Design a protein with these regions (language model features):
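Short hydrophobic/aromatic-enriched beta-strand-loop microsegments
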Residues: 48-53, 134-136
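Active-site beta-strand termini and strand-to-loop segments that position acidic
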Residues: 103-106, 124-128
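Active-site metal-binding loops of divalent metal-dependent hydrolases
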Residues: 33, 55, 115-117, 137-138, ...
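Short, conserved loop/helix-junction motifs that constitute active-site signature segments
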Residues: 42-45, 74-75
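Active-site-proximal beta-strand elements of phosphoester/diester hydrolases
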Residues: 108-114, 133-136
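Metallo-beta-lactamase
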Residues: 2-20, 24-36, 53-111, 155-174
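Cap/insert and terminal regions of metallo-dependent hydrolase folds
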Residues: 1-13, 128-196
């Protein structure tokens, strides 16, 4: 997988295209801190960065190959970490969940999906059309329809694909699941189903 090389694809430029200033970004919820997910943090120096404690701890003390995956220069500017612990078992459609900081709108949950990274999480947001859950790298790039064989899936992205598939089937239009690395145009419009 390659990181975007076109500056227009960066979050900073996308925020500007939407008519906002990067200083308007007050909160960033990361699924994990791998280099391909945290590279834009310095572009939003005043934002609070929300993260699950096991992921922050793994990134601050990486060992072996993880030193390359967790580049400290992405958070050398000293972000304001908002660190989450202790998910409530089964609190969100049977998944363990953590309620985010009180007062944030819309309602959000952090859903631990550990496997791809030590503290990997999904981020679920309640919308007027149901829940939208950014599954990060716990879901294959092409969504559930493109799942690799289970053994490969478990090795690369963790053990959650079968549960996420069951959630999508049980809840239908009430929950929309999105993988990481989805082109921006795929994020527009409500399909009422898992993105494929």
């Amino acid at each position: 997988m390659r990181s975007p090389r076109d500056p227009e694809e960066t979050a900073w430029h996308q925020v500007r295209r939407l008519g906002y200033s990067p200083d308007d970004v007050r909160h960033i919820f990361l699924t994990h801190l791998h280099l391909d997910h945290s590279g834009g943090l310095p572009d939003f120096p005043i934002a609070s960065v929300h993260i699950f404690r096991p992921e922050l701890e793994a990134s601050l003390r990486p060992r072996g190959l993880l030193r390359w995956i967790y580049p400290h220069e992405h958070w050398a500017h000293g972000p304001r970490w908002v660190v989450y612990d202790a998910p409530r078992p089964g609190a969100w459609f049977g998944f363990d969940a953590i309620e985010t900081v009180a007062g944030l709108d819309p309602e959000m949950r952090i859903i631990p999906l550990v496997g791809h990274a030590p503290g990997h999480c999904g981020v679920a947001v309640r919308t007027d059309k149901g829940w939208l859950m950014h599954c990060g790298d716990a879901l294959p790039f092409g969504g559930l329809a493109s799942s690799p064989p289970e053994a490969i899936s478990r090795l690369l992205i963790g053990p959650h694909v079968p549960r996420l598939r069951a959630l999508a089937l049980e809840q239908g239009e009430r929950i929309r699941l999105l993988p990481a690395h989805v082109p921006l145009q795929k994020l527009t419009g409500w399909k009422g189903q898992v993105e494929t």
